[in-house]
């Protein structure tokens, strides 16, 4: 009888300890999941586009509190379905030169915006909502901002390359968005481009129709079409447009 009592006592003690350990590790796992969704998560740099600041394979910690965590249906996202995203309140706005992790808005094609929320890019913020951005001689410029923007050493290097005899003699011009030969924007001379802020209004002239068509169609889920001098959003005639979201201009640090 005494032996049985000892065995029962031993099982009770170690059974309780085992349950406590299981509970402890379950709580750790829950804390890990919650912190990864709402507070901070790790991200591995997938390419060399941020060199020399960040190297391929580097792991960085992404602060989710500053802008606010995003909540969405993970299972739908894994199936490559379009998901509705709810963003929690944040405590500060993104600033110029911040390093941002985001979803690339053109995963499949260049003429329309879409998002794969399970695929991430990392770039440096050059312009924030409400800024007017230009590129002059390969260097970023924002109206009213006198500080540096991006990796100026890489911009100097790119300018020297494009001004080299080989490029000049061949007449090489590297076009950039919106890839319109009449407009003539390139990676060396670009803009001015207004970066839309939530609530800002633009006139639907020929230039703005070209620059902001993708953004407008993504926000409204309607096609923006042109008939002579008339702009149609779906079946409605519009002469100006009020943006629903804030937008940012980002770039890699490496320019080669």
PLM region spans:
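Cytochrome P450 fold signature focused on the C-terminal beta-domain
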Residues: 41-42, 127
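Soluble "head" domains of membrane/secretory-pathway proteins
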Residues: 2-16, 51-256
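N-terminal signal-anchor transmembrane helix
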Residues: 42-53
């Amino acid at each position: 009888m005494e032996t049985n009592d000892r065995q029962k006592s031993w099982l009770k003690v170690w059974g309780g300890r085992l349950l406590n350990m299981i509970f402890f590790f379950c709580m750790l796992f829950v804390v890990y999941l919650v912190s990864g969704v709402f507070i901070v998560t790790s991200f591995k740099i997938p390419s060399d586009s941020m060199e020399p600041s960040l190297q391929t394979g580097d792991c960085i910690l992404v602060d989710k509190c500053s802008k606010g965590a995003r909540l969405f249906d993970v299972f739908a996202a894994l199936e490559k379905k379009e998901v509705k995203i709810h963003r929690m309140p944040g405590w500060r706005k993104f600033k110029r030169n911040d390093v941002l992790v985001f979803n690339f808005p053109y995963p499949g094609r260049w003429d329309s915006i879409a998002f794969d929320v399970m695929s991430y890019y990392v770039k440096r913020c050059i312009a924030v909502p409400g800024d007017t951005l230009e590129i002059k001689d390969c260097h970023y410029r924002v109206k009213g901002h006198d500080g540096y923007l991006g990796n100026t050493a890489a911009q100097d290097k790119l300018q020297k390359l494009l001004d080299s005899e080989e490029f000049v003699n061949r007449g090489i011009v590297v076009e950039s968005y919106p890839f319109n030969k009449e407009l003539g924007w390139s990676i060396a001379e670009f803009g001015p481009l207004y970066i839309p802020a939530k609530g800002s209004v633009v006139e639907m002239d020929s230039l703005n129709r070209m620059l902001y068509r993708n953004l407008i169609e993504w926000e409204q889920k309607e096609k923006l079409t042109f008939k002579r001098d008339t702009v149609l959003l779906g079946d409605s005639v519009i002469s100006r447009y009020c943006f629903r979201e804030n937008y940012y201009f980002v770039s890699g640090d490496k320019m080669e």
